Amino acid sequence: MKKQSGFTLIELMIVVAIVAILAAIALPAYQTYTKKAKFTEVVSATGTYKSALEVCFQTVGSLLNCTNGTNGVPPAAGASGLVTSVAVSGNTASAATITATGDATTFGATSNVYIMTAAGSNGQIIWTAPASGSTCAGAGFC
């Protein structure tokens, strides 16, 4: 009689169970990773405003008049892709805030806000990002 070679049914079932367990662990981690990668679009949307505020601060000498649509700062941006809005607000002579909001459907309504604050003094701006009030930090997106 010839000996048969191959896998038994129980061995195949064990392999399928192991693969299913690994997939169940990897899937949530992958979903968080993809949301974090998508949130970079929201963070990068602030770049134009950041550069414009720095130029305005050097030109004007304060951040007070560096608001949306003035002194080279772009007007507030509406929805585009995964970004819902970007705006400069709360300007004083030495401080300003850039707030970018991501799509609530993609990132969740409680984790879609990215805030950068500028503190200007002695001819330079020091940025804090993500600043207080950024809900994306709690979700690990920024």
Curated annotation (Swiss-Prot):
It is a single-pass membrane protein. InterPro entries: N_methyl_site, Pilin, Pilin-like, T4P/T2SS_Core. This is Type IV pilus subunit protein TapA. Belongs to the N-Me-Phe pilin family. The chain crosses the membrane at residues 7-27. Disruption phenotype: Mutants have no effect on the bacterial adherence to host epithelial and intestinal cell lines. It is found in: Membrane. SUPFAM superfamilies: Pili subunits. Gene3D superfamilies: Glycoprotein, Type 4 Pilin (3.30.700.10). Keywords: Fimbrium biogenesis, Membrane, Methylation, Transmembrane, Transmembrane helix. Major component of the type IV (TAP) pilus. Aeromonas hydrophila possesses two distinct families of type IV pili: the bundle-forming pilus (Bfp) and the type IV pilus (Tap). Coiled coil: none annotated. Its main location: membrane. One of its GO terms (biological process) is type IV pilus-dependent motility. It comes from Aeromonas hydrophila. GO terms for cellular component: membrane; type IV pilus. The keyword Membrane applies. Residues 1-6 form a propeptide.
